[in-house]
């Protein structure tokens, strides 16, 4: 058999093997058999070393024709097998688009966040903006500027979390209320001001109605001619809007170092309609917030003239209002991450 005939026979053998491949694995085996490092076609190129010089050109042409025929057949079969494999996979993965979609489980808005958003929304409708401040406060912003004297009980260690002193001087605390935001805003801006400041506050207390960390909303308004009647109307409107019902509201004289005059605000008990029950301790009233006209000394501390400007301030516990509106009995459940509680009270 001549060299030419041997190469033609090898070509037919390779093409036949390629055509007989039923899957990509079979085709890969054929490639290794003929074109691998020790493959039948690969070994034919070794003939060039022993071939007489005058025959090398012709032998080279035959080998190139063999390789080209092999490659054309191999690529065509490879493309065909890939298409066949894709088609088979698509058939096996075919979806029934008439089936209902899978339910996606989503988280909900925590009742504290929900209450803050609802409170902020009500006050936004009254022209108030939202401000924030640091939770680690200076003694001055948390107490001194708010006219809270050095001997006031609120400054005691059993009520306040004191932390490392400020390197620049002065004591630092975890803020006990969001009123320091009022001081910071009034120090840096001029009236007219309408601001609420929701945020976390910290006190050394823990029982059914108290936790060491809770949320508070401080609000204040400063302008010329501000009076207590405006404060009263504002808070009555807020409570009726937030609780979505017209409730009797009363203002009781009280005392806060940073307001004068000061008042505690009560509303008729939601659970007994003012008739008296366990929740309101038989009084028919529920205490919901404190308020008053900003004390002249506080105005002085922030550089405002109390002869020109007047203002009022109010503060409320977010969890307290949330407990009343959403019917929650224990303040501590807000922070225990009980999925059953969150599923019942979260908004999705």
Curated annotation (Swiss-Prot):
A molecular function (GO) term: tRNA binding
Top class in the EC scheme: ligase
CDD domains from the UniProt entry: PheRS_alpha_core
Matching InterPro entries: aa-tRNA-synth_II, aa-tRNA-synth_II/BPL/LPL, Phe-tRNA-synth_IIc_asu, Phe-tRNA_ligase_II_N, Phe_tRNA_ligase_alpha1_bac, Phenylalanyl-tRNA_Synthase, tRNA-bd_arm
Cofactors, names only: Mg(2+)
Signal sequence annotation: none
Note accompanying the cofactor annotation: Binds 2 magnesium ions per tetramer.
Catalysed reactions listed for this entry: tRNA(Phe) + L-phenylalanine + ATP = L-phenylalanyl-tRNA(Phe) + AMP + diphosphate + H(+)
Keyword Protein biosynthesis belongs to the record: yes
Positions in coiled-coil regions: none
This enzyme's EC code(s): 6.1.1.20
Binding site for Mg(2+): 260
GO cellular component entries: cytoplasm
Keywords: Aminoacyl-tRNA synthetase, ATP-binding, Cytoplasm, Ligase, Magnesium, Metal-binding, Nucleotide-binding, Protein biosynthesis
UniProt KW Protein biosynthesis keyword: yes
PROSITE patterns xrefs: AA_TRNA_LIGASE_II
Protein localization: Cytoplasm
GO biological process: phenylalanyl-tRNA aminoacylation
Source superkingdom: Bacteria
Family assignment from sequence similarity: Belongs to the class-II aminoacyl-tRNA synthetase family. Phe-tRNA synthetase alpha subunit type 1 subfamily.
Subunit structure: Tetramer of two alpha and two beta subunits.
Name the record gives this protein: Phenylalanine--tRNA ligase alpha subunit
């Amino acid at each position: 058999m001549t060299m030419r005939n041997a190469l033609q026979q090898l070509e037919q053998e390779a093409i036949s093997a390629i055509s007989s491949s039923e899957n990509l694995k079979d085709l890969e085996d054929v490639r290794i058999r003929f074109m691998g490092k020790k493959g039948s076609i690969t070994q034919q190129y070794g003939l060039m070393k022993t071939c007489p010089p005058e025959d090398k050109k012709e032998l080279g042409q035959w080998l190139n024709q063999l390789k080209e025929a092999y490659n054309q057949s191999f690529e065509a079969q490879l493309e065909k097998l890939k298409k066949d494999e894709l088609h088979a996979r698509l058939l096996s993965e075919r979806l029934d688009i008439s089936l209902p979609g899978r339910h996606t489980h989503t988280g909900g808005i925590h009742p504290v966040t929900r209450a803050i958003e609802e409170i902020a929304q009500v006050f936004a409708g009254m022209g108030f903006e939202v401000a924030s401040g640091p939770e680690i406060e200076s003694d001055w912003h948390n107490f001194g500027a708010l006219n809270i004297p050095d001997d006031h009980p609120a400054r005691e260690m059993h009520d306040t979390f004191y932390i490392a002193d400020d390197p620049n001087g002065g004591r630092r605390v975890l803020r006990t209320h969001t009123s320091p935001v009022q001081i910071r805003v009034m120090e840096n801006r001029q009236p007219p001001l309408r601001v609420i400041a929701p945020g976390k506050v910290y006190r050394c207390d823990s029982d059914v109605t108290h936790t060491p960390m809770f949320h508070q909303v401080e609000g204040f308004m400063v302008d010329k001619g501000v009076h207590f009647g405006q404060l009263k109307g504002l808070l009555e409107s807020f409570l009726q809007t937030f609780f979505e019902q017209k409730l009797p509201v009363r203002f009781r004289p009280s005392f806060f170092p940073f307001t004068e005059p000061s008042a505690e605000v009560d509303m008729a008990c939601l659970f007994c309609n003012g008739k008296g029950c366990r929740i309101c301790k038989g009084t028919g009233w529920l205490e919901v917030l404190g308020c008053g006209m900003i004390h002249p000394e506080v105005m002085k501390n922030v550089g405002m003239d109390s002869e020109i400007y007047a203002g009022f301030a109010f503060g409320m516990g977010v969890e307290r209002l949330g407990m009343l509106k959403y019917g929650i009995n224990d303040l501590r459940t807000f922070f225990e991450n009980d999925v059953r509680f969150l599923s019942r009270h979260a908004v999705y």
